[in-house]
Regions:
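Polyanionic/metal-chelating signatures
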Residues: 1-27
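His/Asp/Glu-enriched, well-ordered alpha-helical/loop segment
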Residues: 2, 22, 41-44, 48-148
Length: 148
């Protein structure tokens, strides 16, 4: 079982990690996690991926402390950043969402290669779901839909 946890705030993520330690399991990914940048080193060290929006914030109290550099800061700390969306329209344009996060990082001096940002919507989500041996990369034996 690869636990996926829905939460927004850093204190909630830390509390859940403590709960996981007490009960002997590991969290695979936090979803939404708009304050993950505050605990990025902890998340990277524990190999917890973070599935988040590029720029949704402020729509409710838990989402007020989001920043557009969140994806880039998680990546810079060595964590697994993942772009996601709750929107049926946004999910069709995750490449554009990844680009927003990539540009936000570059604006504050975080050098991220385009190939690395592409992992935010390919290899990292596959890892979070535990299907990285089947898809998420272009490699012999893996499944992929490619448009050239």
């Amino acid at each position: 079982i690869l636990p996926q946890v829905h939460c927004y705030r850093a204190d909630d993520m830390l509390s859940f990690l403590q709960l996981a330690d007490e009960h002997g399991f590991a969290v695979r990914s936090f979803h939404h996690a708009v304050e993950s940048y505050k605990i990025r080193d902890v998340l990277a060290e524990r190999e917890v991926s973070v599935s988040m929006w590029a720029d949704w914030w402020g729509f409710k109290l838990e989402a007020f402390d989001a920043i557009p550099e969140n994806l880039a800061l998680i990546h810079q700390a060595g964590g697994r950043a993942i772009v996601h969306s709750d929107s049926e329209i946004g999910i069709q344009r995750l490449n554009q969402e990844a680009s927003k996060g990539w540009h936000a990082g570059r604006r504050v001096g975080i050098a991220i290669g385009e190939d690395e940002a592409l992992r935010w919507i390919t290899a990292n989500p596959a890892w979070a779901l535990g299907i990285e041996d089947e898809t998420g990369r272009i490699a012999p034996g893996l499944r992929a839909d490619l448009v050239v």
